Amino acid sequence: MPAKDIKVALPRSQGHWSNADILRLLECMENNLPYDDNGTFSSTQSHMDWGKVAFKNFSGEMCRLKWLEISCSLRKFSTLKKLVLEAKKCVKNTNKSQKGRNHPDFPKRLLTAYIRFFKENWPQYSQMYPGMRSQEVTKILSKKYKELPEQMKQKHIQDFRKEKQEFEEKLARFREEHPDLDQKGKKSDICKRVQTKVQKKVQKNIEEVRSLPKTDQFFKKVKFHGEPQKPPMNGYQKFHQDSWSSKELQHLSLRERMVEIGRRWQRIPQSQKDHYKSQAELLQKEYKVELDLWLKTLSPEDYAAYKESTYAKGKNMAMMGGPAPSLKQTDPQSSSAKGLQEGFGEGQGLQAAGTEASQTIWVNCQVSMEPEDNRKKDGEEEESSNSLDCSSGEDMEVDV
């Protein structure tokens, strides 16, 4: 159960119970539990001597009522002893997670340029459209922000940068004045186990790569002259490609630009998403036709080199756990291919793979690039998750 649930479960009538009092109550209950507590939760609870649990000004009946309030949010398929220990852990974690940000001196979180514009104009637009849902008003405001002149946008951006600098200075002073509060909460054991497994798998893959012979072209891919460039695989990738070079996003860092593009994708209507999807599908069809025609222009030697390069890439992807790319088999000796190849003299056509090939680092990405539907729209840079992921089963290449 999340730590915040315990606090929510406490009504106003029991507000005089501090976290320290709740911990004391749970400790008293723990001390009065039977040593071999193997009974059900309800059975052990019914035999609890609440008179022995009472402490300070809290009577046994008050302790019993308080425990009933706390246990409302706890799972019941366990022994009473385990539930008491679980409740203690939740109360302690509540103290750790909230004592920093709930501190009166902690600086106020920043608002991005868009969120600042949103808050300033929300009252006006909510009155203009009283019968409209909040989500629809948000879409209108988002559209208005996009239509703002560049000069007005720059004003919001400059205000944000100025406040960001002030926030960082205040945060640095806060950490100096309260070093005991500047401690990151420990992750749960489950997160640590998952992280350890991932790290072990990554380390294993790295060791396998390092053990390959020096001649292995694992991180190299031959770029053949005239080879068609792969288009976006889906609607979101097409939208991302179009938005990446937008002038209004150039002032953002790479990470912020990725996050903003993901947010914009969530705000556009479904009809526009379908439009991008159709564009991506059309580009994929054109790419397949161009690739097929290009393969027919290759000499038998170049076709074999291209096939070997693609096969090596698929083998390496499979070793890293990714899907192997498919290569449509085109017979270079077909009638159409022969007609195109007759004009090739010795030394013409494509040069050897090693002569003009530029080295490319291939990064295999297994997760979907599409942002989650339930992504938060709070606009806080520091707490944005999103990260931008790579397309499913595809590669991103960076020329070096």
Curated annotation (Swiss-Prot):
Which top-level group of life is the source organism from? Eukaryota
Kindly list the places in or outside the cell where this protein is found, as annotated in its UniProt entry.
Nucleus
Q: Which SUPFAM superfamilies match?
A: HMG-box
Q: Where is this region: Disordered?
A: 320-400
Please indicate if the UniProt record lists Nucleus as a keyword: yes
Keywords of the record: DNA-binding, Nucleus, Repeat
Q: Which residues bind DNA?
A: 107-175, 229-295
Stretches with biased composition (Polar residues): 327-338, 356-367
- Which PROSITE patterns does the annotation name? HMG_BOX_2
What terms describe the molecular function in GO for this protein? RNA polymerase I core promoter sequence-specific DNA binding; RNA polymerase I general transcription initiation factor activity
Gene Ontology cellular-component terms for this entry are:
nucleus
GO term, biological process aspect, one? transcription by RNA polymerase I
Task: List the protein's name.
Answer: Putative upstream-binding factor 1-like protein 6
